[in-house]
């Protein structure tokens, strides 16, 4: 299933939220109706919270079914909310704060449950991320950009990436993340940073409300969501 949605009128929903195969996170100000749509489409429990008093959950955090990394300025009460949510839903994963120079982890990491590509800016943390996410981690910029997370979205089934991604980079992503499907594309009326506009897992995708019909079709193809 794939639907278009705004979060309080904002189309760049991937900056504000994230999803794995086990759970989703959304900003504290997200309306209950929006949260319910996320739950239905992604078929996972979803929690609304802030990280570091910020609503930029998808930009600051990164997760798969084995672990989640948080910026070092995450507040204790936010960590408690997250921990309680995971326990309530019997989700046993590693939760780790990472003290890096650039803490926009969601913008810098593209991963699923099979592999992970990180920005070259985070190369020193490759082994740390392998231990947390329990997958192979490769440091590589994509489309000559360090923001591999905001310029791509990946699930265990497929991926959509920045339109300037080269053929060689497509093959690398496909190989590292062990994917059958991958496509180049845009979202939200031509935005190349597709990860900033899409929240997805293998069950479905919620895409920014400004996304056009042709973009939606390419997203469905890349994420292997066409029935």
From Swiss-Prot:
Q: Does the keyword Nucleotide-binding apply?
A: no
**InterPro entries of this UniProt entry?**
eIF6
Arranged from A to Z, the UniProt key words for this protein are: Initiation factor, Protein biosynthesis
Q: Name one GO molecular function term.
A: translation initiation factor activity
The keyword Protein biosynthesis is assigned to this record: yes
A UniProt-annotated Pfam family:
eIF-6
Q: Which GO terms describe its biological process?
A: cytosolic ribosome assembly
Record NCBIfam families: eIF-6 (TIGR00323), PRK04046.1-3 (NF003127)
As for what it does, the entry says: Binds to the 50S ribosomal subunit and prevents its association with the 30S ribosomal subunit to form the 70S initiation complex.
| Record family assignment | Belongs to the eIF-6 family.
Q: What is this protein called?
A: Translation initiation factor 6
Q: What species is this protein from?
A: Methanococcus aeolicus (strain ATCC BAA-1280 / DSM 17508 / OCM 812 / Nankai-3)
